[in-house]
Regions:
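Solvent-exposed loop/turn segments at secondary-structure junctions
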Residues: 105, 252-253, 270-274
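Subset of Sec-pathway N-terminal targeting signals
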Residues: 20-241
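…and closely analogous acidic/polar surface helices at protein-protein or active-site interfaces
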Residues: 258-267, 272-286
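Catalytic P-loop NTP-binding/switch module of NTPases
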Residues: 242-253
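Active-site-adjacent "gating/activation" loops or surface patches in catalytic cores
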Residues: 239-244, 259-263
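Conserved hydrophobic/aromatic pocket- or pore-lining residues that grip, position, or stack substrates
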Residues: 223, 246, 269
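Bacterial Sec-dependent N-terminal signal peptides
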Residues: 1-24
């Protein structure tokens, strides 16, 4: 396996267009006073970059430090251009996938299931590009797992394709994992203060993995890639999911005036069903 040493740009701060709100999710306590906040203990991230599209998956473990069962509210802010593609919540220790339904049907399902004191796992879009979901129960001194994935188009920076994920929140994690896979493209460092990673080539992808314990999220994630100037057709697999990506630039078409016809043919209905028509007006039009 050919090893390539490159960098993921983990930025402490960036200005101008890169100044974005933190997208790190959190679980807030609902309806309880004098309660300790929920703690994000573990974060496992998977970033798949294919062509001009990036899919980011975040699996989180939240801990309830209180000595009683709590109700939490999962809040997840996204930046403009990012769209949720997956949501899952653990039920009886296993992640259960959410589904997209009509708003009215989703609210009815939420109320019906909530009456049974079971968490329906309904992800709701609020103002802007923010999302939230009820998390109940949060067991006393226990944990709940939440998974969310979102897609985005790569942005442009200095003539190169750019991926940016602002997660610098200062949260200290017990365990942190980051896996990055870039399909058929070299990835390069672009900003100082970067974490050096070893990318290994596997078939048509470049893959990097990092694991850290007692890690503080004090920097953001940024990746830059050479601009794609030729057509691409790519495939990739993630578990049981397969992805197909095509990037084809269309040639600019020049406009020209359409040539006027020299003769025009007209079909005129003179059957018995046309007896009540005004033939004089039709002949005048012709």
């Amino acid at each position: 396996m050919k090893n390539l040493i490159t960098s993921i740009a983990l930025l402490a701060s960036v200005g101008g267009a890169m100044a974005q709100k933190t997208v790190l999710p959190e679980v807030k306590v609902r309806g309880q006073y004098n309660a300790n906040p929920m703690q994000l203990q573990e974060l496992s991230m998977d970033i798949l970059v294919m062509g001009q599209t990036a899919v980011t998956t975040m699996e989180m473990t939240f801990y309830n430090p209180n000595d009683r069962v709590m109700e939490g509210e999962f809040e997840f802010p996204l930046s403009n251009g990012q769209e949720v593609s997956r949501f899952a919540l653990d039920i009886d220790g296993k992640l259960r996938e959410g589904v997209v339904v009509d708003k009215a049907l989703g609210r009815q399902a939420f109320e019906d299931i909530a009456r049974r004191n079971v968490d329906p796992g309904l992800l709701e879009k609020t103002e802007g590009n923010n999302f939230r979901a009820r998390v109940y129960p949060m067991p006393a001194q226990g944990v709940r797992r939440i998974l969310i994935a979102f897609e985005q188009e790569l942005s442009q920076k200095d003539g190169r394709d750019f991926y940016f994920l602002p997660i610098a929140s200062g949260v200290k994690l017990k365990h942190f994992k980051l896996r990055t896979e870039v399909v058929s493209r070299m990835v390069k460092a672009d900003i100082e203060n970067t974490l050096q990673l070893n990318f290994g080539q596997s078939r048509n992808s470049y893959i990097s993995e990092v694991k850290k314990d007692n890690y503080t999220l004090d920097k953001n994630i940024g990746l830059t890639f050479p601009k794609i100037d030729k057509p691409q057709l790519l495939t990739a697999s993630k578990g049981t999911d397969s992805y197909l990506y095509g990037n084809i630039a269309l040639e600019k078409q020049s406009l020209r005036e359409k040539e006027k016809p020299k003769r025009i043919g007209i079909l005129w209905d003179c059957s018995s069903s046309s007896q009540k028509r005004d033939f004089a007006k039709e002949f005048a039009l012709l």
